[in-house]
A protein has these predicted regions:
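Short glycine- and hydrophobic/aromatic-rich loop-to-beta-strand nucleating segment
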Residues: 110-111, 223-226, 230-231
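Conserved C-terminal helix/tail region of periplasmic/extracytoplasmic solute-binding proteins
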Residues: 318-403
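Inter-helical turn/loop segments and adjacent helix faces that build the functional surface
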Residues: 163-168, 232-237
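Functional cores that coordinate and move charged inorganic groups
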Residues: 175-176
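Short, glycine-/small- and polar/acidic-enriched structural segments
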Residues: 2-165, 171, 188-198, 205-218
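Short gly/pro-enriched beta-turn/loop segments at secondary-structure junctions
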Residues: 218-219, 261
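Secondary-structure end/capping motifs
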Residues: 235-343
Length: 403
């Protein structure tokens, strides 16, 4: 299955050999763990002298704790989790963290309950009216207080005129438990990664109101995260780990057939433990929202895109810090660029990509327009954090992520 460019395997010889051959690699039961699972199980790591021991976790808080303690060497992780732990707002003491590469873009969703559907709350405008006119306060679930799902949920609600910290309640629910919580009536909606949004639609437990790629086309999502200590102690192991997962990412996107075989692999009990028909369609970009609408999404879940997905852009890391500031999680502006340069392992990533003949991309920043029309390009992050009409900059106490 694996073919290596000339010179790629030179990394496993001599002084460039990995200092650690067995890597404990954490992941959550989400479709976007695909490149990690494929790398570990389909022969992409062994040529580099690595054995990847996959360790499925039941919650992001548990994954965080094992990553910080060293029980996990690296993990499929939320972008916002890595930065929150680094900044000391992630529910643990501050710990120097590292982003080795991006694992995916797009592919998360906001779903609402069948009860709201029965009340004809099936559009952003209807949700805005309901929130501001109903006496009953809605409860939305996300997966970790500083995670990507919390940030997409907050950003999307705010773009519709709904203050995510004042107008609705927010709770943390692990991804695989989302559908059960919705079915039990404990929550009115959620933001989560696949396959759990599609699963809710398949089980007739509500509908998909918005996708994360509608909020920010080709947004950053999961990363390969670890502690800075791991990179410093095992730099060669970190580099070839990136190479193995880069090759797996490229393989998944090589053809629709490879995406289908990946969906089949992920459906197994050891990984997502979910029906194939909840995984495969949206992995192939085929969406059905549960309201009768179907479309082929041009910004569906992607893992590689010639390396554009995988570069740990400085601006991506900085964006999450601007949102922590916006929502009162940070009480003062961090050194946005300085922190991002410390966390994002750009040099190591580019060495790995270049060795595989993958475009290492010369730009450390990228520019995007989000759903509210605002452009984010990494410039003036402090001003950007202050530029939003809805925020919690001055009147919310500092919050910390809890279990």
């Amino acid at each position: 299955m694996t073919e290596h460019p000339n010179g790629a395997l030179a990394w496993v010889n001599g002084s460039d050999a990995p200092e650690k051959s067995a890597i404990n690699l954490g992941f959550m039961a989400l479709t976007d763990c695909a490149s990690v699972v494929v790398a570990a199980t389909q022969g992409f790591a062994q040529p580099y002298g690595l054995t990847l021991n996959l360790k499925r976790q039941s919650s992001w808080a548990g994954l965080r704790d094992k990553l910080v303690s060293g029980e996990l060497d690296a993990a499929h992780s939320l972008y916002g989790l890595i930065y929150a732990v680094h900044l000391g707002i992630g529910g643990t003491h501050p710990c120097d963290m590292a982003v080795l590469m991006g694992l995916n873009q797009n592919g998360q969703s906001i779903n609402l309950s069948r009860e709201l559907q029965a009340l004809k709350v099936t559009s952003p405008e209807a949700l805005d009216r309901h929130v501001h006119q109903s006496r009953a306060r809605l409860t939305f679930a996300q997966t970790f207080p500083t995670g990507t799902h919390a940030m997409w949920l907050y950003y999307w609600l705010a773009s519709q005129g709904i203050h995510p910290l004042r107008d609705v309640d927010s709770v943390v629910v692990p991804p695989p438990q989302m559908v059960a919580h919705l079915q039990a009536g404990r929550i009115d909606g959620f933001c989560v990664g696949e396959p759990w949004s599609a699963s809710a639609v398949q089980q007739d437990q509500g509908f998909t109101l918005a996708t994360s790629q509608a909020i920010w086309p080709d947004h950053p999502e999961k990363v390969l995260g670890c502690t800075r200590a791991f990179v410093e102690q095992y730099p060669n192991a970190a580099r070839v780990l990136v190479m193995a997962i880069l090759e797996a990412s490229r393989f998944i996107e090589h053809s629709p057939e490879n995406r289908r075989s990946t969906a089949q692999l992920l459906s197994a009990a050891d990984y997502l433990n979910a029906p194939l028909d909840c995984i495969e369609p949206r992995l192939l970009g085929a969406y059905a929202d549960g309201l009768g609408n179907r479309w082929q999404d041009p910004h569906a879940l992607r893992f590689h895109h010639h390396g554009a997905v995988n570069l740990p852009y400085l601006s991506d890391g900085m964006w999450f810090m601007t949102q922590f500031r916006r929502w009162g999680l940070l009480r003062e502006d961090p050194d946005y660029l300085g922190v991002a340069r410390h966390v994002q392992q750009l040099e190591l990533y580019r060495e790995a990509a270049s060795a595989l003949g993958i475009n290492p991309w010369g730009q450390d920043m990228r520019s995007s327009q989000l759903i509210d029309g605002k452009v984010w390009d990494g410039s003036e992050p402090a001003a950007y954090a202050r530029s939003f009409r809805l925020h919690a900059l001055n009147d919310s106490p500092a919050l910390a992520a809890q279990r």
